[in-house]
């Protein structure tokens, strides 16, 4: 159950997109010096993300203890063939149905683009999802600032690393993290243009912060 999930996690609070460097599934490669094309350095206004989060998301939940009893509108998100869920430290593996569907679509399109280039199979790495009010509070305290991650309170928002990708197969051509980060940028850009999501390029956090615009 949920309680067991939390018992297995070491609960430390770090920056929103900070995460471990390796995984027991596949092999994760990291390059913090990748250059994302300027077209994919999304700068959607936080207010737009927050408006969408409140419109399409759930009512914020105070604590992880209360999350156990109040997650009916949230869907459990687990690693699969399309994406790897990183070891979550300041969030829980839940999203709304709409957000979970968009995350899967990003993963599918990312892999389709790799396949087109005859590149080796990789998955995207998800570094943050649903946050309780207490998670937000502790993150702010740890960072000693008032960074506003509140879109994560509504289950509509997730962070995807653009510096780390998880290799799941060795057939095909080797592919650099820089190539993959721009493929990821293109995929998110296409969905953003369709009105599926808003996005913010978080250089200091090495992630793209995505808020969906659908139920």
Task: Walk through the language-model features, giving the residues of each.
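Catalytic cores and adjacent binding grooves of peptidoglycan-active enzymes
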Residues: 147-215
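Stable alpha-helical elements in mature extracytoplasmic
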Residues: 95-102, 106, 120, 135, ...
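Bacterial N-terminal signal peptides
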Residues: 7-14
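Extended, low-complexity, intrinsically disordered C-terminal regulatory tails
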Residues: 107, 111, 118-141
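Short, small-residue-biased leader/transition segments that mark boundaries at the very start
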Residues: 1-6
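Extracytoplasmic cell-surface/polysaccharide-interacting catalytic and binding patches
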Residues: 18-114, 211-214
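Extracytoplasmic/periplasmic, Sec-exported soluble proteins
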Residues: 91-102, 131, 149-152, 172-179
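Alpha-helical scaffolding within the catalytic cores
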Residues: 141-147
């Amino acid at each position: 159950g949920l309680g067991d999930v939390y018992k297995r996690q070491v609960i430390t609070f770090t920056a929103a997109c900070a995460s471990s460097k390796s995984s027991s599934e596949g092999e994760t490669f990291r390059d913090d010096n990748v250059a994302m094309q300027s077209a994919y350095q999304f700068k959607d206004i936080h207010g737009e993300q927050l408006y969408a989060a409140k419109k399409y998301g759930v009512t914020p939940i105070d604590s992880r203890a209360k999350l156990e009893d109040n997650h009916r509108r949230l869907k459990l998100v687990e690693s699969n063939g399309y994406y790897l869920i990183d070891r979550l430290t300041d969030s829980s593996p839940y999203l709304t149905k709409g957000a979970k569907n968009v995350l899967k679509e990003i993963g599918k399109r990312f892999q389709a683009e790799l396949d087109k280039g005859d590149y080796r199979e990789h998955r995207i790495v998800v570094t943050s999802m649903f946050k309780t009010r207490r998670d937000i509070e502790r993150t702010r305290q740890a960072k000693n600032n008032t960074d506003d991650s509140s879109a994560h309170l509504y289950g509509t928002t997730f962070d995807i690393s653009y510096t780390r990708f998880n290799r799941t197969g060795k057939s095909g051509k080797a592919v650099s993290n820089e190539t993959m980060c721009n493929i990821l940028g293109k995929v998110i850009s296409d969905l953003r243009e369709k009105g599926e999501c808003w996005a913010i390029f978080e250089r200091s956090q090495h992630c793209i912060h995505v808020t969906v615009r659908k139920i």
